[in-house]
């Protein structure tokens, strides 16, 4: 087990002037489960492959523990990698697949068998040790691939979208198994995914990348509560945070027919940048619907006393998930039509085509600079 350090690590592919990974700076603690997440092409898999030694590092350094491994070959890094496709040998049994790396390393048969059986017990694979991969389900094959990594007892686990080939239900159960297994083994793990739900549920910390640049690295809770910029705010959360550009008024921001109070330091910071508007972020669950007796509207001042409080939302689609309902609608802001998602009780879902008015709850507003995208509120 060991710490992992990306020290301004950079990768520029031949023939390109733009780095695929640009000055990546992350310190990963011993035994930590860190998830790299971002859209396709953001550099997350490239970062993992740089750590594995499968990609050259053109600038900066990578360290595992006290060792600088920047230019070491993969075999000398003491890492084990699990891929999206399981890469099992079809002609070998499960036991032979799991122990193959140890066999190549010259470990004696008795020790190999002992380590394979221990890993199989952890992964509930004991009864399948004599089977061939074709006789296993997708989830079982993925566990065999993990077992092959476990028996090597590496300092660092690397996982590159290992759940992508599994169906939705199996993905949920397997991700909980991987997270609990990592906590039991205590081995430092770097996990790559494009699925932010996976990232939020599995990682001790999450690192969000975009266009090769690190946007934010933090605990899942802090990242959800305090996204560093507009990209993170829109990427983390399902459904995503609503982002609406609204004008600054005295003491707050104009939200439809209501004035929502905002931290004065945030408004001053926006004014200092020359912004006349700010981008307000509100999670779907942090709206009150006026027509459903939402209490937040009563605390806000209104521009026009005879008009309903808040922002008028035209309901286009209603999704009912059983426990909750989600309103997918459109709003008119500054002459532009914007999409908005609001979570409501499944017992009080409006009709499609209806118009409802929404206001954000006090203290649940995120304010971002419209010009730079950076977070302005604490």
Curated annotation (Swiss-Prot):
GO MF: ABC-type transporter activity; ATP binding; ATP hydrolysis activity
Residues holding ATP: 38-45
Alphabetical list of PROSITE patterns matching this protein: ABC_TRANSPORTER_1, ABC_TRANSPORTER_2
SUPFAM superfamilies tied to this protein: MOP-like (SSF50331), P-loop containing nucleoside triphosphate hydrolases (SSF52540)
Entry keyword set: ATP-binding, Cell membrane, Membrane, Nucleotide-binding, Sugar transport, Translocase, Transport
Membrane topology classification: Peripheral membrane protein
UniProt subunit comment: The DasABC-MsiK complex is composed of two ATP-binding proteins (MsiK), two transmembrane proteins (DasB and DasC) and a solute-binding protein (DasA). The NgcEFG-MsiK complex is composed of two ATP-binding proteins (MsiK), two transmembrane proteins (NgcF and NgcG) and a solute-binding protein (NgcE).
Protein family (similarity comment): Belongs to the ABC transporter superfamily.
Name of the featured protein: Diacetylchitobiose uptake system ATP-binding protein MsiK
Source organism per UniProt: Streptomyces coelicolor (strain ATCC BAA-471 / A3(2) / M145)
Gene: msiK
């Amino acid at each position: 087990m060991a710490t992992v350090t990306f020290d301004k690590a950079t990768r520029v592919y031949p023939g390109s002037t733009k780095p695929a990974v640009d000055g990546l700076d992350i310190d990963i603690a011993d035994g930590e489960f860190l998830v790299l997440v971002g859209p396709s092409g953001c550099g997350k898999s490239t970062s993992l492959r740089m750590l594995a030694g499968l990609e050259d590092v053109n600038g900066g350094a990578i360290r595992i523990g006290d060792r600088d491994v920047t230019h070491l070959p993969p075999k000398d890094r003491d890492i084990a990698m699990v891929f999206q496709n399981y890469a099992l040998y079809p002609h070998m049994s499960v036991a032979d697949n799991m122990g193959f790396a140890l066999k190549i390393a010259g470990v004696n048969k008795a020790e190999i068998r002992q380590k394979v059986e221990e890993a199989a017990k952890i992964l509930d694979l004991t009864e399948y040790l004599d089977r061939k991969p074709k006789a296993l389900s997708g989830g079982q094959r993925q566990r065999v691939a993990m077992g092959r990594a476990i028996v090597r007892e590496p300092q660092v686990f690397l996982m590159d979208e290992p759940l992508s080939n599994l169906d939705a239900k199996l993905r949920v159960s397997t991700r909980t198994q991987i997270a609990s297994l990592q906590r039991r083994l205590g081995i430092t793990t770097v996990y790559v995914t494009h699925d932010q739900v996976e990232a939020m549920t599995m990682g001790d910390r999450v690192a969000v990348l975009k266009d090769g640049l690190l946007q934010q690295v933090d605990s899942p809770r802090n990242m959800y509560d305090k996204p560093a910029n507009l990209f993170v705010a829109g990427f983390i959360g399902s459904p995503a945070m609503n982002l609406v550009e609204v004008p600054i008024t005295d003491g707050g921001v104009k939200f439809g027919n209501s004035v929502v109070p905002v931290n004065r330091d945030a408004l001053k910071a926006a004014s200092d940048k020359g912004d006349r508007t700010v981008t307000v972020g509100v999670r779907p669950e942090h709206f009150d619907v006026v027509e459903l007796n939402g209490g937040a509207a009563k605390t806000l001042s209104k521009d026009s006393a005879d008009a309903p409080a808040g922002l008028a939302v035209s309901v286009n689609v209603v999704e009912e998930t059983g426990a909750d309902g989600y309103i997918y609608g459109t709003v008119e802001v500054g002459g532009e039509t914007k999409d908005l998602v609001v979570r409501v009780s499944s017992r009080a879902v409006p009709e499609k085509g209806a118009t409802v008015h929404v206001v954000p709850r006090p203290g649940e507003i995120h304010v971002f600079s419209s010009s730079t995208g950076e977070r302005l509120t604490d």
